[in-house]
Design a protein with these regions (language model features):
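Juxtamembrane linker/hinge segments adjacent to transmembrane helices in membrane proteins
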Residues: 1-30, 34, 248-249, 253
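Short, glycine-rich, amphipathic interfacial segments at transmembrane boundaries or analogous
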Residues: 5-8, 53-54, 197-202
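Membrane-embedded segments
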Residues: 39-155, 169-171
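Solvent-exposed loop/turn segments at secondary-structure junctions
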Residues: 64-65, 102-106, 163-166, 189-193, ...
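Short, well-ordered secondary-structure micro-motifs
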Residues: 108-110, 168-171, 195-199, 248
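A cross-kingdom signal targeting lumenal/periplasmic-facing segments of multi-pass membrane
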Residues: 156-160
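Solvent-exposed, extracytoplasmic
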Residues: 165-178, 185
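Von Willebrand factor type A / integrin I
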Residues: 178-253
Length: 253
């Protein structure tokens, strides 16, 4: 089921913001109702061993910098497109989805119902995260717990992000994944960065700092590479080519 802490931010419209299109909220309410009905039943059905072994947890960065437009139209849109392509092509195995900013939340536990994950994915944005910031460590810890809860002795973790701000804590969390659940990083964004355009529900303005200057988040590839080297994670840059999906469509060796 969806993380209870995230549910209010998915379903409740903050009164201090302008009104938003109700269709995504209605869609999400429908999806949640389906999950509520199906959840207990699916948990009682043991998954085939091969399906449990081909388990993938996708970890999506929902910090404000993901609204930067240095990759058109934004880092977040490109990340969602990549996840969408992956889910549509991934016909076997179980997939889970976690989002993180200042904390981490499970959008979906490990499941073979990719259509439901896709429906939830379209609604996600930084403005719904309860805590600001960028903390990868709790997301990696949560990923491991999803594998354990699903009875998956092996699996893979794919993190789509533009930074690793809490490297020491994230390294500790990554070490707990060990060889059972190897970690991969997919970086989205550029070294030059770009302004962060806020969504229409927040006035369609650009994010500014306390001095009124535009916030332009640049991707520090060197820092991410250092984290990848220290954690043993593989590292790639996000692109939307279909051939880049092949590694995620085959069960791990």
């Amino acid at each position: 089921t969806i993380d209870p802490e995230l549910m209010p931010f998915l379903l409740v419209q903050p009164t201090k913001k302008p009104s938003v299109n109700p269709l995504p909220i209605l869609l999400l309410a429908w999806v949640v109702s389906i999950l509520a009905v199906a959840g207990p039943t699916t948990q009682k059905i043991p998954k085939p061993i091969l399906e449990r072994e081909d388990a993938l947890v996708i970890v999506l960065d929902l910090t404000w910098s993901m609204y930067a437009s240095d990759v058109t139209p934004s880092r977040l849109v490109n990340a969602k497109r990549k996840i969408t392509d992956l889910l549509m092509a991934r016909n076997e195995g179980m997939t889970g989805l976690i989002v993180f900013a200042g904390d981490a939340h499970a959008v979906s536990p490990l499941t073979d119902d990719n259509k439901t994950i896709l429906a939830l994915l379209s609604t996600l944005g930084p403005e719904m995260m309860p805590a600001p910031g960028s903390a990868l460590a709790p997301a990696l810890t949560l990923a491991r717990s999803l594998f354990v809860s699903a009875g998956a002795a092996t699996g893979r973790v794919l993190v789509i992000t533009d930074e690793v701000r809490d490297a020491p804590a994230a390294l500790s969390a990554a070490s707990a994944l060990s060889d059972q659940y190897p970690l991969s990083l997919m970086v989205v964004g550029t070294q030059s960065g770009a302004p962060i355009r806020l969504p229409q529900s927040m006035g369609d303005n650009f994010l500014k700092d306390a001095q009124g200057s535009l916030v332009i988040p640049a991707v520090n590839f060197d820092a991410i590479q250092r984290f990848a080297n220290a954690s043993g994670a593989s590292l790639t840059e996000l692109n939307l080519l279909n051939d880049a999906l092949s590694i995620w469509l085959e069960p791990p060796n």
